[in-house]
Amino acid sequence: MSVTLHIESTDHEGQGIARNDGKTVFVEGGLTGETVAVRITRSKPNYDKATVEQVLQPSPFRVTPDCPHFGVCGGCSMQHLDARAQVAAKQRVLEDNFKHIGNVAAEQMLPPIEGPHWGYRHRARLSVRHVAKKGGVLVGFHEKRSSYVADMRECRVLPPAVSDLLLPLRTLVERLAIRDRAPQIEYAQGDGVPMLVLRHLEPVGDADLALLRAFTVEHHVQWYLQPKGPETAHPLAGEAHTLGYVLDEFGLRYHFQPTEFTQVNPHINAMLVRRAMCLLELRPDDRVGDLFCGLGNFTLPIAQQAAFTYGIEGSAPLIARARENAAGNGLSDRVDFAVANLFEIADDWFDTLPRLNKLLIDPPRDGALAVVKALPPAA
C-alpha cells in the first residue's frame, strides 16, 4: 500500500525523514521539501523504513544521478541531490547532531570547503567476491546497506584511469588460483602510478604472480601483496614504490606507503591545511601540539611557522613516516613526535607533555572524547 508523505529533513545517510501519524519514517530516495508516495519496507516500534515509489512534488535541487550504479552501490548516497545542496544538507545534519546529541550550538559556522565532485578519490577499498549467478568475480564497493558486492562497471568518484581498471581486475581475479581467497583490493594514489594492494588469505603461487606482473605491465600500476595485517604489505617485486603528494602552497612533499592513512581527496586536503593554518594564527614563538598527527600532514606546515611543534599519533609506523617526512623537508630540528594511544589517556596527561600554547586536533571518526575530557580548564 502506498502512503503519501512530506519529507521534513535528511539524515547523515542521505535518507529523507518524514512523519506518518507521528511516527518517524526514514525514506530511501526522498529529499527535504518533497512530497512523495512511498512503500513501507520495514516497521519497527519507534520508526519505519520506506522507499519512494513516486515523487509527487520534487525538490528544486533534485537532479538525475550521473552514476549508472546509483541506488544499488553503497559508495554514494546523495547523487540525486545537487552537489552544492549536498554540502548544505550535510551541514544541517552536523548542526542537528550538535543540538540533539551534544546539546550544544555552534557559535560560528565556517564556510564549507568544496572541491571536485567526480574523479577525486585517491584511496579506496574494493571488495572482491566470486558470484556465480552474476557471471563471475565482482570488484567494487558494497551494495547499499548490504554485505553484497555491487556489480560495478565503472565508478565516477574514482579517477577515470582507476575506474577503467574495474573490469580488467574482475578478469584478472577470475583467473587467479586464489580467486576465492582474495577478499579485497585496496587502491592508493599519490602523484605517480596507482598502487593496488591485494589482500590474500593463502600464499600466492608462481602462476598467480605471473598474472599480477603481466597486469602491472599492461595497465601501468604497481602491486603490493598483503597476507595479514597492513604492516605485512610488501611490493610484488623489487624495492618498495613509495607514494607521494605535495602541498604546493607550503613547498612540502610527503611520502607514504599504500596502506598508510592519507586523506581520500587531495584537493580538499590542501584546502583543509590552509584553513587550519589560518585558524591557528601562528606566531614565531608558538609551541603547537598536533594530536592524531598521522604522517605529519598538518604538523609540517605548522613547524614551518612555529617555534616548536609536537606531533602525537597512536600508530608507531605512521610516527616513523612523519619523522621521515620532517627530515625530507628539512624540519627535523623544529618538530618532535611521540606515539600515544589518544583514546586512553589519563586526566593529567597534558601535564606530561612539553609546554604547548596551541593545539590542533584532527581525530578519526571515533572522535577524541578522552582528549577533550583531559583538556586543562584554560584550554
Where are these predicted regions, by residue range?
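Short, acidic/hydrophobic/Gly-rich beta-strand patch recurrent on exposed beta strands
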Residues: G16-D21, G140-E143, A322
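Short beta-strand micro-motifs enriched in acidic
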Residues: G30, R39-S43, S127-V131, A188-G190
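Terminal RNA-binding accessory module
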Residues: M1-P65, H69
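Internal alpha/beta scaffold segment
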Residues: Y148-P183, Q189-V193, E202-P227
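Extended interfacial segments that mediate partner engagement and assembly in macromolecular machines
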Residues: E53-P65, G71-A182
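Rossmann-like S-adenosyl-L-methionine
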Residues: H12, R175, P203-A379
